[in-house]
Amino acid sequence: MIKSMRIFLLISIVLTSFLFYKCSKKDTDEPKEMTVNFYMVALEGSTLQGKTIGCNDILVPISKNVLIEKNEVESAMNELFAAKSTDKLINFIKGPGLFLYQVTLSNGIAEIYLKGDFAISNVCDVPRIQGQLYETAKQFSDVREGKIFINAQSLESYLSLAKQGFN
């Protein structure tokens, strides 16, 4: 009798623990699938549709279903960094040792931290890089501002130094 009570008690404890664990898990604990955009560049003269940026290039949104593991901004940025150029769409988010280091999202502000360097070949690359990064970050309703840093400085400071090399 005592042995069967112990077995019953043990089974009850295990089941209760399992139920508490399952009930306490939030939906956000598991990755969810979502459609995100990342932006590629169509050069001046293209017939593709999108937002016109400096040097009369066009930012073209590319939609993709992805798993959101941390936050949607980071997932979209990962897609942008992984995207390969084609004959009609170019990805200017490339360069020696360039990688996405960290993305935080708090109170409507997305902070994106990059390390490495961009491969900038002319003055038109500056608005291309800015456009691709900021449009990819700001597409989400819970992001009202995007702040991008590269090698511990603002993207604007980094790109203004690069731009000076072409003047």
What spans do the regions from the language model cover?
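Bimodal "functional hotspot" detector
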Residues: 2-11, 18-167
